[in-house]
Amino acid sequence: MSIHMHEHGKDMKYMLMFPDGKVQTILNQPRYDFNWQMTYGLEETIHIPKGTKLRVMSHFDNSRGNKFARDPDKDIYGGEQSWEEMDAPWIGLVLDRNVDPATAYTENPGDEATFWTSPLADAR
């Protein structure tokens, strides 16, 4: 998993919402720093049953208290440049060998998402 935001990024959290109602936080970075471009791994494998949803929540700070805020009086919009903002979470999955990658993932309407597969996707 990775967290990618720009200079106004404040925090990001990944949560699994299981079909039985259980919620499990799998990554929580409460003090994001633009200078950190890290990938995070899990200590233990998590079995994710069909119907589980991944929710990623992030916040941004354009206040005078953020030393990276160039002009707190201006609105910030999404974009590719560092002075613009983005929320680009990434997660890699290892699929059970009996799961068809084409049906393992669905995205919410209106959301932009990418599903990556590779020859290493077979589970042990």
Question: Which residues fall in each region the model found?
Answer:
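His-enriched metal-coordination microenvironments in redox/metal-binding proteins
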Residues: 1-102, 110-124
